[in-house]
């Protein structure tokens, strides 16, 4: 038997219970009405404002209910409700008041009828949601332009649209003691590893939190190594990529109110792949993948290597290149380490400003800001032209990494390479590579 307070046949008791818990919630409406012959049966409709359209309340569900039950006696009314004589596709009887409350707060219409010991959940449009649109974070030249929205129902439908097979299972979970956020696991029953699926379920069930408002909260609470700056779950806003990974035997975790899906389990190379790799020829996709891996290495290693070479190991460079470096640094009052750190932090400010600026200006601030700051710093002899080139190449390389969370991790560890490369040379860079923190 379901835990909770059962719905009773006494409508007044049910109404008092719901009104006491909805006190102070002006957006929750409790609408009394009369059904049956001569209005002999009392009923109560409970819903959240703007989640149930007027069409449902006046012309569709309740309107049809008034017409269908106008000449029926109380017993016939109960039988009609029990048998769902209106043919509502999403009508479901609920045993307890808590189930009814959760269903109503999820955006459904809850109907209580005098003499009927169950609540009737009637599906509606739910909460207002953004329509399906392009994704700004994972742009591609070839492939679908659809992106996930904040509605888990819509996101599930976008995946089902691409995998029209009953072997694709959609499993619902709930997270958040107060938020009661709906989670969905999407997987192919014949392809997924049962051990992986069970581990994901345990990871979700093991934490207790008031509210889950985004998939990023689940990502942080379920990751195994919280010390590492690198992401342990691949994320995507593209339903075509999610469908591809489901067909590969992975599990897609969707979170209500979040357009970002988690792809489980994940390995490092997943973060370097893009959707277009599946659509392009093997030779082209392989070449582009090599470029991305090279950009990944440059993004965190280039600046530190530059400092190590010009500060400690100039003998490995040709004489002409050494002279060029020395000439570019004439008149610069700061050591190479400080000028590189200055430019790196300046680029971080430009990047952050570009993200926070309005859309019409965000694209301009990065280009114009970089040109102005770089040219002004060189003209004022604060930094050398070579340092600007190195830092710009490092920043450009980071933009080529497909996964933003992975990019942020490389941007963070880059400063460790800069400090050790500038202070200890190649020995410092080697120290980072051979060191591995051990957790006990």
What are these regions (language model features)?
Residues 253, 260, 266-417:
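Transmembrane alpha-helical segments that form the functional core of multipass membrane systems
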Residues 164, 205, 351, 378, ...:
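Short polybasic/polar patches that bind polyanions
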Residues 373, 433-434:
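Aromatic/hydrophobic pocket-lining residues that form π-stacking "cages" and hydrophobic walls in ligand
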Residues 379-385, 422-430:
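Transmembrane helix interruption/hinge and helix-loop junction motifs
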Residues 1-301, 315, 319, 435, ...:
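Membrane-embedded alpha-helical signal segments
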């Amino acid at each position: 038997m379901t835990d909770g307070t059962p719905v009773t046949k006494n409508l007044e008791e049910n109404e008092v219970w719901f009104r006491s818990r909805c006190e102070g919630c002006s957006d929750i409406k409790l609408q009394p009405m009369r059904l049956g012959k001569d209005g002999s049966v009392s009923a109560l409709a409970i819903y959240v404002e703007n989640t149930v359209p007027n069409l449902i309340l006046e012309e569709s569900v309740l309107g049809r209910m008034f017409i269908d039950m106008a000449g029926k006696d109380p017993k016939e009314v109960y039988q009609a409700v029990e048998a769902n004589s209106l043919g509502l596709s999403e009508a479901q009887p609920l045993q307890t008041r808590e189930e009814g409350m959760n269903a109503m707060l999820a955006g459904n219409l809850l109907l209580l009828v005098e003499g009927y010991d169950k609540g009737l959940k009637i599906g509606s449009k739910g909460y207002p949601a953004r329509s399906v649109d392009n994704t700004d974070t994972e742009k591609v030249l070839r492939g679908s332009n659809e992106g996930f929205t904040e509605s888990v129902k819509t996101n599930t439908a976008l995946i089902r649209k691409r995998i029209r097979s009953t072997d694709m299972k959609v499993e619902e979970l709930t997270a958040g003691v107060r938020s009661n956020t709906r989670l969905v696991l999407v997987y192919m029953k014949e392809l997924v590893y049962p051990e992986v699926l069970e581990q994901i379920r345990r990871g979700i069930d093991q934490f207790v939190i008031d509210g889950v408002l985004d998939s990023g909260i689940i990502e942080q609470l379920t990751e195994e190594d919280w010390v590492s700056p690198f992401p342990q779950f691949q994320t995507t806003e593209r339903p075509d990529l999610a469908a591809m990974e489901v067909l590969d035997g992975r599990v897609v975790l969707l979170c209500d109110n979040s357009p970002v899906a988690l792809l489980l389990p994940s390995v490092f190379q997943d973060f370097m792949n893009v959707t277009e790799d599946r659509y392009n020829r093997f030779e082209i996709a392989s070449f582009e993948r090599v470029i991305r891996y090279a950009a990944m290495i440059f993004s965190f290693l280039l600046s530190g290597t530059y400092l190590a070479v010009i500060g400690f190991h100039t003998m490995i460079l040709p004489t002409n290149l050494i002279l060029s470096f020395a000439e570019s640094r004439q008149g610069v009052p700061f050591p190479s380490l400080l000028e590189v750190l200055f430019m790196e932090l300046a680029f971080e400010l430009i990047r952050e400003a570009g993200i926070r600026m309005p859309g019409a200006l965000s694209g301009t601030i990065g280009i114009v800001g970089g040109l102005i700051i770089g040219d002004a710093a060189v003209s004022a002899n604060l930094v050398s032209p070579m340092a600007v080139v190195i830092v710009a190449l490092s920043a450009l390389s980071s933009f080529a990494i497909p996964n933003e969370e992975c990019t942020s991790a490389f941007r963070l560890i880059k400063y460790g390479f800069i400090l050790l490369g500038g202070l200890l040379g190649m020995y410092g860079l080697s120290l980072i590579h051979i060191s591995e923190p051990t957790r006990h």
